[in-house]
Every structure is written in structure tokens, then in C-alpha cells.
């Protein structure tokens, strides 16, 4: 087949391929052969990196609510601000410490640039904290060395070293606080690897990195510049060239400029990283920081404990939306409104069958569904494990088929329609959505079903020729049944008698004597719930004249439900003939 694409005409000559800017060569890379088997150390940066990207930065009350959410979820390292950059951030750090909001096993993290007055102010903010991470950074990229700082490699290294030495100096003022150091060569992805390692190793020496006194070396994709595999290669290269490796915690801080922040974090973790920084639902500058929700739940669905509690995803989302004053998109992985919703007919049918198979397999294994291995088509995770219901799993629009319609009827009303009845009713829904457009809600679906198959007694006279009243039967020794039925025919109350080998056959006899050409082709029934007092649902497929169609009946009596189903089919045929 010929490719008909044509050149875009866009100014591609203005952009340089990444490989022409930075060399990343790891021909003996090992990360592609690895799999994730345990969670990394997490650091949530919503209160600093996320907050600085908001149109309306968080108020102190919203900041505290976000901090409390992160603690509740299980994050043990939380970046809480840039206390030397604003009085607001300084005051919030003091509020957390003085207000006793920091659990003993949680380390707050604060950011600072490599300038003395900023570092001094940073340490002032930490007085009284049990433990803290001081995060020092300066930009090292080729571009920023040239256009921002006008410095060569040695000049940028001197800035970093001066900052590290000042941190050590002011650490002496915090005798009751355990300090862990973190250093970021900001814009790492735009920095030559050899130079990045030179700077990081020099900083690790100043901070006296060792197995007993580990230093966090954070390698941010401050701007995502290449494909995730390139980022992973750069992390593996650094993993091999940072010293002493046992004294280094390699941390990742991916952004999402190319839309692959999650993939970059996962591959970078495979490549030797120990820790990942990010934000809930991917908030952050430009296209955002890596999404901690997606990362954590990607591990969960592979059977790896993320060490973070996502079991009430809607509450997490509501809190994040309140604090950030930004909506979480409907398609945001795991947390969006539509991520567990299927509109497609084939998807709905597969999901319906998947639920049925899951129940069957769990019962065969002697386990509850909630404790059985989750395998349902199109649903990589059980919504219930995130605190969601199944209500939104299947929704009906013009793209939906019988599977989705049948699922909603069974899940919400315990009606298990035979397959051909599913096909028939999905056609009714299809005609409705084609004519009106939009989505059909669960309540609307049920109303359409009732109008089509289960009119109330008051409505029967309006569209149905026949109404079923009281019925009595007698069976002789040969098994033949005589039925006396009170019917409403064209609005007139009448009493009719019929004979047959059962209730349906006897009612058919009555209808035949009234001139109705009807034959029963198929019949099924089931209880609507467990217990002796449960109502029954009956489904009767009939040939009425030239039409083949279904009737449905619901009644506490199984016999009456089957008779109602037969009347339903006949009435539908009469209504269609009159339409």
C-alpha cells in the first residue's frame, strides 16, 4: 500500500536531534532485561514543584490539606517548599514543625539554590525539625551554562561546591535535626554525562557520602529532551560512574514535555535508580511532573506493592483538585472519571463475559471474587480496589452493543436476558441513540426497558391490547390444564377459558381463540434474588404473525411472570403493527 503522507512544511530545520547535542552511549546496557519487583523510595513534590506551577498557588490551608493527604497515603519524603524564596514558604515550613504536623517517620524536604543568604535562611526554617532533606541545586546544562550563567564547566562546578560547603557550615546550627543532603544537577538531560558525573561526585565528597551517610543525587529530566530509553541509558551510565555507589541514592525527577514521563521514570528505575520524585496526577511546570498515581498503580497491577495507599482514589482526586484548583482530566490513568468506562459494544460484551467468568472461576476455587486473581478484559485493575463501584464501568451510547446493555440490566436490576433478547433490546437502544444522540444513563435505560417490555397496569391499556388479571388453573389426572383468566381486551374486562399441558399452553389457547396467531419459540426464567420470597423474571420469544420478538414478565409468582411475558410479546407485536 502506498504511503500518501506528504512533507508538513513546518520549519524542522530549526530543531536539533538530541543525539547531535548530547552523547549517550551504553552499548552494554542491562536495564532492558530487568523488571520492577519492588517500589522505589518515593518523594512527593506537590507542595513545591507542583505548587509553583499553579495559576493560583495554594493557600496555607490548602497546603496543609495536601500535606495531610500525602502523609495519609504513606509518603515518607515530602518536599514542602522553597523557604528562602518567599515568606509564605518559610512560614509554611514553620507551621508544619511548630504545629506538630510531621510524623516521626516522615522527612520534609526543602529546596535551596547555592547562595549563602538563601542557604542560611533555609536552615533557619528547619529549627526544631526531627529530620529533614536539604535539596541543593544548580543548573549544569550546556545551554544554561552558555545563555544563563555565561560560565564554563569549572565555573558551574565552583557554584555547586560553594553551595555544598555552605550547607555543611550551616548544618552545625541544627544540632537536634538529622540532615540528609540531596543534590540536583538541574537540566541534567541537557548536560554531558561525564561532566554531570564530575559535578555529582565532587558534591558527594563534600557531603561525605558513605553507606552510613547516604547522599541523594537527583537526576532530573527538567525538560524531557529524548525518548525514555535514552533517559534510561543516561541513568545506567550514571549508576556505573557515581562514587561511592553505596553512599549514593540515585533519584529521578522526570517531567512530561514529550508525554513520556511515566515511561522515563519506569525505565530509569530499571536502569539503577533508587528513588522517584513526582506529583499526584502529574501536576507541575508546563506539561507537568511525572504522575505518582500512574507510577504507583502501574506497579500495583503487576502485583508489586507500591507502598502507597490508593484505595480511595476519588477522595485523593477530590483533595488534589481542591488544593490545586485544577481538574483531573477524565482520561487521567486510574483516577479520571472515564478510565473504567466502556462505550464500545465489543468492549462491553467482553467485560460482561469477563465478570461472569471471574465469578465462575472464583467459585470453582472456593474463593470470593474480591480475593481471586483479577482478569477481566479491558479493565487492568478492579475498580473496587480503588474504592470505585462498577456503576460507571459500562455506559451506553450509539457505539454500544448488546453486551453493555445486558451488563447494566444484570448489574443494576438482576435481569439476565437471553442472548437473542439482548440483541433485540440493544437494537431498541441503538435506534434511540441514533435518533436523539448522546449517552443513555442507567436510569434512562431502565425507563426505556420498562416502556418497551414492562408497562405499568395503567399504561397497558394505552399501548397494549391485552391486560392480564387474575388467573386460576385446574389440572386433571392426565395432566391437562384448564385455565380461567380474567383479561382486559381493548379496555374491556372479559373472562376466558383455555386448555393446554401447562400455563403457557393454556394462555396460548385463549389467545388463539381470540384470533391471535402466536407461537412460543423459546422460554427462560430466573429468580431476581436469593430467598423464597424473590420475584421471578421470565423471557418468552414468540412468533406473532410474521414477527419474532421477545416478551418479559416480572412477578413474585413464576407462573404469572411467564404469562406476563407472553402478554408482553403479543402486546409489543400489536403495538408495532399499529405504529
UniProtKB/Swiss-Prot annotation:
It catalyses: 3-methyl-2-oxobutanoate + acetyl-CoA + H2O = (2S)-2-isopropylmalate + CoA + H(+). It is found in: Cytoplasm. Pfam families: HMGL-like, IPMS_D2, LeuA_dimer. Keywords: Amino-acid biosynthesis, Branched-chain amino acid biosynthesis, Cytoplasm, Leucine biosynthesis, Magnesium, Metal-binding, Transferase. Mg(2+) binds at residues 49, 253, 255, 289. Pathway: Amino-acid biosynthesis; L-leucine biosynthesis; L-leucine from 3-methyl-2-oxobutanoate: step 1/4. Belongs to the alpha-IPM synthase/homocitrate synthase family. LeuA type 2 subfamily. NCBIfam families: leuA_yeast (TIGR00970), PRK03739.1 (NF002991). Catalyzes the condensation of the acetyl group of acetyl-CoA with 3-methyl-2-oxobutanoate (2-ketoisovalerate) to form 3-carboxy-3-hydroxy-4-methylpentanoate (2-isopropylmalate). This is 2-isopropylmalate synthase. It comes from Paenarthrobacter aurescens (strain TC1). The lineage of its organism: Bacteria, Bacillati, Actinomycetota, Actinomycetes, Micrococcales.
Amino acid at each position: 500500500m502506498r504511503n500518501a503522507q506528504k512533507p508538513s512544511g513546518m520549519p524542522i530545520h530549526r530543531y536539533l536531534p538530541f543525539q547531535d547535542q548530547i552523547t549517550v552511549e551504553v552499548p552494554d546496557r542491562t536495564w532492558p532485561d530487568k523488571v520492577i519487583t519492588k517500589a522505589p523510595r518515593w518523594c512527593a513534590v506537590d507542595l513545591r514543584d507542583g505548587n509553583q506551577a499553579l495559576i493560583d498557588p495554594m493557600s496555607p490551608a490548602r497546603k496543609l490539606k495536601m500535606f495531610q493527604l500525602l502523609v495519609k497515603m504513606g509518603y515518607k519524603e515530602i518536599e514542602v517548599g522553597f523557604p528562602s524564596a518567599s515568606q509564605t514558604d518559610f512560614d509554611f515550613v514553620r507551621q508544619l514543625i511548630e504545629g506538630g504536623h510531621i510524623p516521626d517517620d516522615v522527612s520534609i524536604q526543602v529546596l535551596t539554590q547555592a547562595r549563602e543568604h538563601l542557604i542560611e535562611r533555609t536552615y533557619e526554617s528547619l529549627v526544631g525539625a526531627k529530620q529533614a532533606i536539604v535539596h541543593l541545586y544548580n543548573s549544569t546544562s550546556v545551554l544554561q551554562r552558555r545563555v544563563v550563567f555565561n560560565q564554563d564547566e569549572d565555573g558551574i562546578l565552583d557554584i555547586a561546591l560553594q553551595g555544598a560547603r555552605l550547607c555543611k557550615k550551616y548544618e552545625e546550627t541544627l544540632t537536634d535535626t538529622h540532615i540528609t543532603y540531596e543534590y540536583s544537577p538541574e537540566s541534567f538531560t541537557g548536560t554531558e554525562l561525564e561532566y554531570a558525573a564530575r559535578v555529582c561526585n565532587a558534591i558527594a565528597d563534600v557531603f561525605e557520602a558513605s553507606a552510613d551517610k547516604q547522599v541523594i543525587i537527583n537526576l532530573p529530566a527538567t525538560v524531557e529532551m529524548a525518548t525514555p530509553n535514552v533517559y534510561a541509558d543516561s541513568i545506567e551510565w550514571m549508576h556505573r560512574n557515581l562514587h561511592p555507589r553505596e553512599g549514593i541514592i540515585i533519584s529521578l525527577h522526570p517531567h512530561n514535555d514529550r508525554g513520556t514521563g511515566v515511561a522515563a521514570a519506569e525505565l530509569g528505575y530499571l536502569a539503577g535508580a533508587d528513588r522517584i520524585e513526582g506529583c499526584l496526577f502529574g501536576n507541575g511546570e508546563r506539561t507537568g511532573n511525572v504522575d505518582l498515581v500512574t507510577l504507583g498503580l502501574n506497579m500495583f497491577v503487576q502485583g508489586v506493592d507500591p507502598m502507597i495507599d490508593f484505595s480511595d482514589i476519588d477522595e485523593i482526586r477530590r483533595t488534589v483538585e481542591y488544593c490545586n484548583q485544577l481538574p483531573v482530566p477524565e482520561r487521567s490513568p486510574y483516577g479520571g472519571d472515564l478510565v473504567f468506562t466502556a462505550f464500545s459494544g465489543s468492549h462491553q460484551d467482553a467485560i460482561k463475559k469477563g465478570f461472569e467468568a471471574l465469578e465462575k472461576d472464583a467459585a470453582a476455587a472456593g474463593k470470593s471474587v474480591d480475593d481471586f486473581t483479577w482478569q477481566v478484559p479491558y479493565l487492568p485493575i478492579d475498580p473496587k480496589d480503588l474504592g470505585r463501584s462498577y456503576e460507571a464501568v459500562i455506559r451506553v451510547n450509539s457505539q454500544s452493543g448488546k453486551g453493555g446493555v445486558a451488563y447494566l440490566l444484570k448489574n443494576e436490576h438482576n435481569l439476565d436476558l437471553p442472548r437473542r433478547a439482548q440483541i433485540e433490546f440493544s437494537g431498541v437502544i441503538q435506534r434511540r441513540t441514533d435518533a436523539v444522540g448522546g449517552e443513555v444513563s442507567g436510569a434512562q435505560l431502565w425507563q426505556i426497558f420498562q416502556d418497551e417490555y414492562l408497562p405499568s397496569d395503567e399504561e397497558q391499556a394505552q399501548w397494549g391490547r391485552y391486560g392480564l388479571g387474575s388467573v386460576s388453573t385446574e389440572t386433571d389426572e392426565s395432566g391437562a390444564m384448564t385455565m380461567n383468566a380474567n383479561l382486559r381486551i381493548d379496555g374491556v374486562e372479559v373472562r376466558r377459558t383455555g386448555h393446554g399441558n401447562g400455563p403457557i399452553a393454556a394462555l396460548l389457547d385463549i389467545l388463539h381463540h381470540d384470533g391471535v396467531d402466536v407461537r412460543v419459540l423459546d422460554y427462560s426464567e430466573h429468580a431476581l434474588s436469593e430467598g423464597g420470597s424473590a420475584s421471578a423474571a421470565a423471557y418468552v420469544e414468540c412468533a406473532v404473525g410474521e414477527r419474532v420478538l421477545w416478551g418479559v414478565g416480572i412477578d413474585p409468582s413464576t407462573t404469572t411472570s411467564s404469562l406476563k411475558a407472553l402478554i408482553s410479546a403479543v402486546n409489543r407485536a400489536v403495538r408495532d403493527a399499529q405504529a
